Amino acid sequence: MQSSPPNTQHPSPNTIELLAPAKNRECGMAAIDHGADAVYIGASRFGARQSAGNSVEDIGKLCEYAHRYGATVHVTINTIIYNDEFEDTLALVRELVAVGVDAFLLQDMGLMSKVREIVPDTVALHASTQCDTRTWEKAEWLSQQGFDRVVLARELSAEEINGIHSRLPELELEAFVHLSLIHI
């Protein structure tokens, strides 16, 4: 049985969210136990974290656990999607929504437009770091396309991140603190 989703209101622009990578359900639960506000995880296909092989069922169990403790679960669907994979990708998105996923990290603009049509407004869409966002203009454009949050390029300095934030104070921005080298 799916638990109730956490408060889906977006954090204030001054709120910092601790978002941790989760190789699998157990790692995600451990991150939540140690204070993570949210975790991101890959499904078995279509994401940069697909090698972990997490089933929809496992992600659903992680969602139940996370929601019990007021945390959220974000799923990466951020690889290049080919024509022959498009419908399977949308089917996976529907399955993940059904088990309680709170957000998707996407990089394919065509996929994003279709995902926005099929998921409820309570499910957030985040522009993945694979979008390589380095300017406020690109971040603004991604927001205009329907993304709720933009994950900035990993190489940006704190000064560059602040510059984007100062131009777009209402847009949720996400930045890697320890790059992609730290895995729980």
Regions found by a protein language model. Give the residues of each.
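Acidic (Asp/Glu)-rich catalytic clusters
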Residues: 32-33, 60-70, 97-98, 116-120, ...
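N-terminal basic/disordered segments at the start of proteins
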Residues: 17-38
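Hydrophobic faces of well-ordered beta-strands that scaffold small-molecule active sites
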Residues: 18-21, 39-41, 73-77, 104-106, ...
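Short, well-ordered coil/turn segments that N-cap beta-strands
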Residues: 14-16, 37, 67-73, 101-102, ...
